[in-house]
């Protein structure tokens, strides 16, 4: 049953991308030439979707998140839902993510348009200046999420942090 639920969950996301995400991208972002809030639609969609699949999300400490200043979330990557929860809780979120994700259709396009920054695992020299890019963009109000372990830790055990931005 859990596998079927997961398939339906992701199918719902695909349908939402087609009927909400792409029109929002065109009518709001493309025409205004402003992609900074492309992820804002997620702040409404995921809180609506989670209860439909029995997903209970509790956000603690949201009062500590600045309203206007950019900030960086450093999080343990525990499950496939982490990114969805972050999108639901925090608008204008970009990610520091492995560069191979930019090759995934649509997903890579969204990462690029939202100001996300790629981490090059195969060529660490390309990562030079990443901290400066993050600092510049947070000064402009961007929010970033970093999963410093570099992969999901499904059992809750923390992996050693990768030295991409640290």
Q: What does each model-found stretch correspond to?
A:
Residues 1-58, 109-110:
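A transmembrane-helix-recognition feature enriched in membrane-embedded lipid enzymes
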Residues 56-166:
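Soluble catalytic domains of membrane acyltransferases
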């Amino acid at each position: 049953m859990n596998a079927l639920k997961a398939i339906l969950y992701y199918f719902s996301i695909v349908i939402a991308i087609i009927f909400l995400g792409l029109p929002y991208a065109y009518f709001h972002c493309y025409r205004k030439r402003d992609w900074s809030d492309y992820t804002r639609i997620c702040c409404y969609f995921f809180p609506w979707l989670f209860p439909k699949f029995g997903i209970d999300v509790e956000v603690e400490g949201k009062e500590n998140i600045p309203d206007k200043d950019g900030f960086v979330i450093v999080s343990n990557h525990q499950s496939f839902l982490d990114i969805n929860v972050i999108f639901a809780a925090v608008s204008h979120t970009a990610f520091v993510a492995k560069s191979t994700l930019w090759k995934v259709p649509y997903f890579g396009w969204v990462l690029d348009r939202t100001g996300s920054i790629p981490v090059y695992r195969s060529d660490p020299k390309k990562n030079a200046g990443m901290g400066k890019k993050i600092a510049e963009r947070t000064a402009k109000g961007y929010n970033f999420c970093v999963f410093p372990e570099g992969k999901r830790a499904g059992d809750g055990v923390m992996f050693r942090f990768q030295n991409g931005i640290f």
